[in-house]
Amino acid sequence: MKKIDAHAHIGVFGGWAKLSLTADELIAQMNEFDIEKTLLCSQPNELCLDAVNKYPDRILGMVYPNPYDGQKAVDMIYDYVQNKGFKGIKCNPLKQAYVADDEIMDPIMQAAEDLDIPVFMHCGHPPYSLPWSIALLAERFPKVKLTMIHMGHGHGVYIDASLKMAKRYPNLYLEMSGMPMPSKIREA
């Protein structure tokens, strides 16, 4: 059976636990658990690029733009996808303080549509990344495959909303890392 990790990070994560993970350590974990490939969503983008270049057969890069950068962010997406082989876009409204369906996302989504690549979006932190807002973005860009990362992030109301929105919009997908409710994973 093929295993693909659809959402991983490397780098220094800080916090009380002082967590960190290098590309080499990620590959060691992948080998230990027979994971064939990993979609890497890390900032800064150069860190992700270094990992992709070091392990091109194992690590697939997701470019991480800041929508507040406007055209610069769009140009970066095109560069990373067309010239560096990245496979999609990762967005985190919570980290950069914008609401998921804000018009600031339109140039990012238009680039995804033009390049025919998916967008992964962190889901489950009010007021920025609620399932309803992500669904409105999916509705506005029906040709873009949009994945709700964490499927509501462990909050029952957001998990149920993620399930309902994914059923309503055919271009909206669920990703289940950090999901503490096996019954909801089965329901998905």
Stretches with model-predicted labels:
Residues 17-21, 42, 71, 99, ...:
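Conserved phosphate-coordination/catalytic loops
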Residues 10, 14-16, 65-68, 94-97, ...:
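Short histidine/acidic/glycine/proline-rich micro-motifs that form metal-
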Residues 28-33, 50-54, 79-83, 136-137, ...:
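A generic secondary-structure signal
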Residues 1-49:
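An N-terminally biased module of ancient metal coordination in phosphate/nucleic-acid-related enzymes
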Residues 36-37, 45-126, 168, 172-175:
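Active-site gating/metal-coordination segments in enzymes
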Residues 22-26, 45-50, 72-77, 130-135, ...:
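Alpha-helical scaffolding within the catalytic cores
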Residues 101-188:
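Catalytic pocket-lining loop regions of alpha/beta-barrel enzymes
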